[in-house]
Amino acid sequence: MEKENNKNRKKKIKIKAGTGSNKTFLLKREFLYKETETLLLTNIVNKKVSTPEKDLNKAQLNVASSNIIKLNEQNKNTNKKILTISKISKTLGGKPVLKNISLNLNHGQILGLLGPNGAGKSTLFNLIVGKIFPDFGEIKLNNEIINDLPIHKRAIKGISLLEQHKGLFGNMTAYENLYAILELHIEDKSKIESKIFQLLSYFGLQYLVNVKANNMSGGEYKKISTLQRICNKDIKVLLLDEPMAALDPLSISSIKKFILELRDMGLSVIITDHNFFAIQDILDNCIIIRDGVVMVEGPPKDIIKDQKAIKYYLGTGFKI
């Protein structure tokens, strides 16, 4: 038995098939804070939840819209810095990946972090969330230095990352995917359901309540994945790694609207992408990095005027 538990710790908790709409959840450890892992490993195999038989009814939607999720009002003060990165450097495998990087993210702001493959965007995200630590420099959240904080403590303080290739449990519905995370933090089932209804209703996604992740469009999948990252804690800074990747134009437009709604909730957002023109219309500020160095910084309306800079730092395929 001990050998089997160790195997699950290294990989993931195996799913136990249920009957009807009841399932025992498969949960990856990456979704959890360190303090909740023991709870998960000892109890999750006995937990079951039923997906609602019908879509949200009118009464539920009214309750949801009267209890719209709102983050702390101070998060909407766009003149105050929430995240400050000062002269960060990082070497990986003997190669300098980031060189003296500095940036500021204000409350309620959307910041674009652009650059070609290998520019250092993902490394910077990993430094912010605490997957790796800087060799030099300083990271502050709300003016508190967090350089030495591990990933789970940074998550508790309100930093969340949605990686490009990480997402939902494909055989589970939107409701089940959100429930699987919320049940680790909320004991009252009715409160969990209320929270899910609020989230889905606020973003107009209630029609996905019974849709399995494998049957969602690319845009729908990314929206529910994002909600999974913000549903169980007071997120202050949301990092989105190429949220437009592999999406059709209609889905890109929908995701951009969704990100603006996240900003309107009070979240501060950093987006990575290769394509300046795909996201420039939703950005408050933009930073272009190349070979681990900040090359261009400023409002999109100023950067878009510099065709030579865009072609040089992002590639000759870009045109104005």
Model-predicted regions and their roles:
Residues S190-L208:
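Conserved ABC ATPase "signature" region
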Residues G137-I145, K157:
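Conserved ABC transporter NBD signature motif
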Residues V129:
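Helix-to-loop junction immediately C-terminal to a conserved catalytic motif
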Residues H165, M172-E183:
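Q-loop/switch helix immediately C-terminal to the Walker
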Residues L238-E242:
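Catalytic Walker B motif of ABC-type/P-loop ATPase nucleotide-binding domains
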Residues K212-M216:
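Conserved ABC ATPase signature
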